[in-house]
């Protein structure tokens, strides 16, 4: 985008040589948190590989960081990553009806904001004819929020007060939406507490 080469790190449940072509997998398009600065998209490959072992195709997004492109470039690049995975669904055995987007820290914000945009909102669509909708969608208009939202927040988060997630949860719940929030006791802004077997089981369900 804008002359900047971008990459996806793709982790599959099996090696490319042993993929069962008859088995389709859900896909998580994952945005690595970086305070919207330059990312290290290899930072969580080990942790994300554990989700792949549970049957997910993982696509870790590299976006144009805020030092070279203003917001909402990061969300737009995430949308194009979603489209890329849809176009290449057959190649990676992705179930088109089970594409999700998520992320940690600023990546979680970017992932959610990617679903607030629409194709006519400054969108730079590299793949015309392919939408960037996912299984979990958050719309800016609360009456059109249709899909489930899952949030994790540490009770000792020193960056974002956990009350923020609680407030979002309460607002969406009052609108009759399907939303869950898990407050992880003693967890700060990220860390191993977010990647336990228990939290992974919640995600894959």
Pin down the residues of each PLM region:
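Short beta-strand/loop motif that positions the catalytic acidic residue
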Residues: 145, 151-153, 157
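Primarily recognizes the serine-hydrolase "nucleophile elbow" in alpha/beta-hydrolase
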Residues: 80-144
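The conserved beta1-alpha1 loop
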Residues: 31-33, 85, 141, 153
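Short beta-strand element of the alpha/beta-hydrolase
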Residues: 22-34
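C-terminal catalytic histidine-bearing segment of alpha/beta-hydrolase fold enzymes
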Residues: 150-152, 166-205
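N-terminal cap/lid segment of alpha/beta-hydrolase-fold proteins
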Residues: 1-23
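Conserved alpha/beta-hydrolase "acid-adjacent" motif
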Residues: 158-167
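Short amphipathic alpha-helix adjacent to the substrate-entry channel of hydrolases
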Residues: 41-60
């Amino acid at each position: 985008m804008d002359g900047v080469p971008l990459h996806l790190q793709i982790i599959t449940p099996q090696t490319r040589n042993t993929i069962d072509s008859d088995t389709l997998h859900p896909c998580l398009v994952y945005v690595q948190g970086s305070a919207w600065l330059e990312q290290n998209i290899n930072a969580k490959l080990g942790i994300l590989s554990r989700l792949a072992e549970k049957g997910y195709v993982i696509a870790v997004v590299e976006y144009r960081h805020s030092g070279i492109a203003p917001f909402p470039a990061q969300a737009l690049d995430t949308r194009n990553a979603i489209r890329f995975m849809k176009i290449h669904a057959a190649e990676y055995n992705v179930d088109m009806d089970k594409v999700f987007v998520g992320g940690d820290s600023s990546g979680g914000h970017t992932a959610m904001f990617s679903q607030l945009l629409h194709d006519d909102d400054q969108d730079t669509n590299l793949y015309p004819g392919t939408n960037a909708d996912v299984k979990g969608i958050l719309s800016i208009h609360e009456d059109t929020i249709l899909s489930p939202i899952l949030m994790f927040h540490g009770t000792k988060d020193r960056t974002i007060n956990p009350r923020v997630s609680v407030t979002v949860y309460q607002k969406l719940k009052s609108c009759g939406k399907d939303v869950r929030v898990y407050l992880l006791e003693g967890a700060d802004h990220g860390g191993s507490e977010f990647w336990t077997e228990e939290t992974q089981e919640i995600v894959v369900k």
